[in-house]
A protein has these predicted regions:
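Surface-exposed loop/turn positions within long extracellular repeat scaffolds
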Residues: 1-56, 66-87
């Protein structure tokens, strides 16, 4: 199961990913709250992703642009760079 969020969101609550893949194609797609990722978070975008990422899931960087993860990240599932640059 895959859900793609492409617009900018302004909610401040957290995001919980418990199964499948959540694809964010905009650095503002997940609002400003913490992300608890226990499945797969795919960031198909460039820019500065400032949300904190925790949980046991994997983070995937896709898309051609450069992406910075500047939040306080504690996720343990590893990072896969399928395309683009992670800085």
């Amino acid at each position: 199961k895959t859900l793609t969020l492409s617009g900018s969101n302004t909610y401040t609550g957290g995001t919980l990913i418990s199964d499948g893949t959540l694809v964010a194609s905009n650095v503002e797609s997940l609002g400003t709250g913490d992300v608890t990722n226990n499945a797969t978070l795919e960031l198909n975008t460039g820019g500065d992703f400032t949300n904190n990422i925790g949980g046991s899931g994997q983070v995937v960087k896709s898309g051609d642009d450069a992406l910075a993860l500047s939040g306080a990240n504690s996720y343990t599932g590893g990072t896969l760079i399928s395309s683009g640059t992670l800085v």
